[in-house]
Amino acid sequence: MEFDFLAPLDTDLLIDIKRLSSQHLSSKVVFHTEHDFPDVTKVDLAIIGILENRGGHSESNDLDLSYVRKQLYSLFPGNWSKTIADLGDILPGNSEEDTYFAVQKVVSKLLKHKIIPIIIYMYA
């Protein structure tokens, strides 16, 4: 299945996010954890991270999107009713092409379900 490419969010990140108040965006998001995967049939927006930087200026293996996620989830939501899921990260494949194949499969599946993908990617 296409969603097998997705790794769950880091436990420490989830703990930090859960510490935010119910007024923050984090309270409106369903997260991919080690034990649970969001039901995509009930989602309008899906966030995925891409941990790939081969081909960039820096090929460091230390990509971490936690800071971006912490900042995003500490925002305050507006008055809207869209459901959001953070589906986790696509890990680097054996090659850069493998990673982007996984991205294409995941995004294609989301779009087939009429889910808007939001991609977090750091070009280093």
Residue ranges of model-derived segments:
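Metal-dependent C-N hydrolase catalytic cores
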Residues: 2-124
